[in-house]
């Protein structure tokens, strides 16, 4: 699969909040990138998605009962 197709899939997953899948897709895209700038971009997006996953961005937690 070419870089651009995988990058598009990664971006769509990221926009949908599927950060685990997006991080894996960005990592794979980085490995396919022919241009250094594309590789760096994909690595940065992967790192952002991994951070979002760790910090549970977009996860709605139930309120604790008092």
Placement of each model-derived feature along the sequence:
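Boundary/linker segments of alpha-helical solenoid repeat arrays
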Residues: 34-42
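Alpha-helical linker/edge segments of TPR/alpha-solenoid repeat scaffolds
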Residues: 46-66
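Hydrophobic/aromatic side-chain positions at a characteristic register within alpha-helices
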Residues: 14-15, 34
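Conserved small-residue packing positions in alpha-helical repeats and bundles
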Residues: 10-11, 30, 47
